[in-house]
Regions:
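Bacterial Sec-dependent N-terminal signal peptides
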Residues: 1-23
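Start-of-domain marker
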Residues: 21-89, 100-102
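A cross-kingdom marker for long, charged
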Residues: 28, 213-301
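Second-shell loop/turn segments in exported
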Residues: 32-40, 128-136, 246-247
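Sec-exported extracytoplasmic/periplasmic mature domains
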Residues: 51-59, 151-154, 266, 270
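Acidic/His-rich structured neighborhood in mature extracellular/periplasmic domains
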Residues: 84-195
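Flexible, glycine-rich surface segments
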Residues: 158-250
Length: 301
């Protein structure tokens, strides 16, 4: 009996120790625009501390195995830096990926450029997220993107599966509007943090949520076993994208999806499937982003 209890205790300890955090992020900071040589040590410190914070923080109650962690990248370009105040003006390019079933291919799930990734940072500043008492815009933005990455990843596996975590991102938005930085408030910019999340959760854009699920789970994940059926499912998902665009033509969300998925979609249909399928894919993508006509011409061949 004692041996059995010992084994159970050992198993529980192993399970707890084998649980991993949700994100596996790579942070890169580019500072070529900054001539001040004093900054390099600070920038290197910021890069390491940000990466450790994102990867070591437990963002949700979810239990992930190491191999299930979500790959993501935070590429930060410093445009301005005040060494006296510690104020940074930077641009963030964030993207997350997930593996496609039965393949070695990773697909981009969510990618966004944030031109207002501005914050104050001094070496030694605490890096911890306290939802009810956060005063750091840097920490708020990282928390927002962490929840967005997790939420959008869940959306790709089940219909509206990321709702809880997208609402957590929404909570960050609501609590950060008094921090005094751009990106959190409505009407500043339709592509800002508030605008993209608000539009995505808007019932009028429900087609986007159908798209995220059907494109990935019903489409890409079956591409190896049944390419024709998978392409048909992806086209059906793109019809939902078209519906979302028609419902809110001024929303940036449908166009954002086409920007980071365009090349992948072209590769899926170019020279494959039926001519009717290729023509329909062309029409959908062109209607959302007419400036991409030259790139879309591959679908016509």
């Amino acid at each position: 009996m004692k041996r059995l209890l010992y084994f159970i205790l050992l198993l529980l300890c192993f399970s707890a120790s084998s649980a991993a955090q949700e994100l596996k992020a790579k942070v890169s900071i580019k500072s070529q625009k900054i001539s001040n040589s004093k900054g390099k040590e600070i920038f290197d410190d910021l890069q390491k501390r940000l990466q450790d914070f994102i990867n070591e923080n437990k963002w949700t109650e979810l239990q992930f195995r190491e191999e299930e962690r979500i790959d993501c990248s935070f590429n930060i370009t410093i445009n301005k830096w005040n060494d006296n105040s510690g104020q940074f003006e930077t641009t963030l390019l964030m993207s997350s990926t997930r593996p496609v079933f039965n393949s070695s291919y990773n697909t981009t799930v969510w990618s966004v450029k944030d031109d207002n990734f501005h914050f104050k940072y001094e070496p030694g500043d605490p890096m911890e997220y306290a939802p009810e008492n956060n005063q750091s815009n840097l920490i708020a933005m990282i928390a927002y993107y962490a929840y967005m990455i997790i939420g959008m990843d869940m959306e790709s596996f089940s219909l509206k599966g990321g709702q809880k975590y997208l609402e957590m991102a929404e909570d960050v938005v609501n609590k950060s509007q008094d921090l005094g930085y751009e990106g959190w408030k409505p009407f500043d910019n339709s592509k800002n943090r508030f605008g993209l999340l608000n539009d995505y959760l808007d019932g009028a854009l429900e087609g986007m949520r159908i798209l995220m699920y059907e494109y990935h789970r019903k489409g890409l994940d079956h591409m190896t076993e049944n390419p024709d059926k998978a392409r048909a499912s992806i086209l059906e998902a793109l019809e939902a994208l078209s519906d979302a665009h028609k419902a809110r033509t001024m929303s940036s969300v449908p166009q954002l999806f086409t920007e980071y998925k365009r090349e992948e979609i072209i590769n899926i249909f170019s020279g494959k499937g039926t001519r009717d399928e290729r023509n329909r894919v062309y029409d959908i993508l062109f209607s959302i982003d007419p400036s991409s006509a030259t790139k879309l011409d591959k679908l016509k061949k």
